[in-house]
Amino acid sequence: ATRPWKCCDRAICTKSFPPMCRCMDMVEQCAATCKKCGPATSDSSRRVCEDXY
């Protein structure tokens, strides 16, 4: 899968084909290409992009 962001250190993917992935990186601000940006569960001051790709 092609990810819509430059950096994704913590990707979680399903075992389906093609796999669906989410990037679990905690960032200060989501990338402009992120459609759904939410607060990180472990640190509410950080953000996580909730888009699947």
Swiss-Prot record:
UniProt keywords, alphabetically: Disulfide bond, Protease inhibitor, Serine protease inhibitor
Taxonomic superkingdom: Eukaryota
Coiled-coil boundaries: none
Record-linked Pfam families: Bowman-Birk_leg
Alphabetical list of SMART domains matching this protein: BowB
Disulfide cross-links: C8-C23, C13-C21, C30-C37, C34-C49
Annotated site (Reactive bond): K15, S16, T41, S42
InterPro entries per UniProt: Bowman-Birk_prot_inh (IPR035995), Prot_inh_BBI (IPR000877)
Protein name as it appears in the record: Bowman-Birk type proteinase inhibitor II-4
Organism whose genome encodes this protein: Triticum aestivum
